[in-house]
Amino acid sequence: MLDTAGKAEAHAPPRARAWRGLDAVIGNRIALAGLVIIAGQIAAAALAPLLLSHAPDAIDYRAMLQGPSEAHLLGTDELGRDILSRLLSGARLSLSVSTMAVTLAVVLGLPLGLVSGYLGGWPDEILMRLLDSLMALPPLVLALTIAAVLGPGLFNAMIAIAIVSVPTFTRLVRGQVLSLKHNDYVTAAYSVGTPTWRVLFRHILPNAMNPVIVQATLGIGFAIITESSLSFIGLGAQPPTSTWGSMVQVGFQYLELAPWYVMAPAAMMFLAVLGFNMLADGLHDALDPLARTG
């Protein structure tokens, strides 16, 4: 009974599934808490120029490494710049770069997974072996290697993160296509003369998107950590650009004198990753019909 209900919901129109999924996310406390954390960080970063009186790059040598005060709520850095302003400025970059990296990985991984899963045979075998070779190294080590080859810079870090993430989405979509391409509604579409490209993008891809959405949400959290790690070792954001990772990298040198310098961006990274993981957990429950009906 439950299995039948789950299958019926899985084959429901995408728009109907989206609305039911949204209702389920709102009703899931963990997912809602994650969404609130993420929305709060995005809102704070977007409104920072309107709410804060200090520019992120404004230097004041008379206020170097000052602790939190009324004038500087989170203190100042080694050049007297307001840490709160730089923290929120860095939030815009860290969140946007991570989101764009995952978006690029999805854009590249979706068609590769579709073609690989649909064609099968030697094209699928060759692609899977190539992806296996990429996944042989730990993701962070592979991202570091690619970023080192491309050179330091935020754009190159984004490309490195995207390349590392592509195999995950390709294999995920491929697995979904393999399980969906022999379903009755796909066979029925072929029987009435529907072109292959339309079957793929109209009947198979929409039904394969739920795990992709969950993985993309998790992937943003991974991208934040990876971008911060690359910036920490000098392969990401370059001065005077501030991201959470670059702030931790510089602040680590003043850990004993100004512990707040490191704690603020580290806390923001922790909250962001926690928020995306909580949201992904809730999305999994919301978008998986078998999980919800069970």
Predicted regions mapped to residue ranges:
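Amphipathic alpha-helical segments that mediate coupling or scaffolding at interfaces
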Residues: 24-25, 64, 86-90, 94, ...
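Internal alpha-helical transmembrane segments of multi-pass membrane proteins, especially GPCRs
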Residues: 35, 92, 96-100, 142, ...
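Amphipathic cytosolic juxtamembrane alpha-helices at the membrane-cytosol interface
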Residues: 19, 81-96, 100, 120-128, ...
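Generic hydrophobic transmembrane alpha-helix motif, especially the helices
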Residues: 73, 77, 107-109, 114-118, ...
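Gly/Trp-centered helix-boundary motif
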Residues: 1-110, 114-115, 121-122, 193, ...
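Transmembrane alpha-helix boundary and packing residues in multipass membrane permease domains
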Residues: 41, 114, 143-148, 157, ...
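Glycine-rich helix-loop "coupling/hinge" segments at transmembrane-helix boundaries
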Residues: 135, 146-149, 161, 176-177, ...
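Short helix-capping/hinge motifs at transmembrane helix termini and TM-loop junctions
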Residues: 48-56, 117-121, 146-152, 164, ...
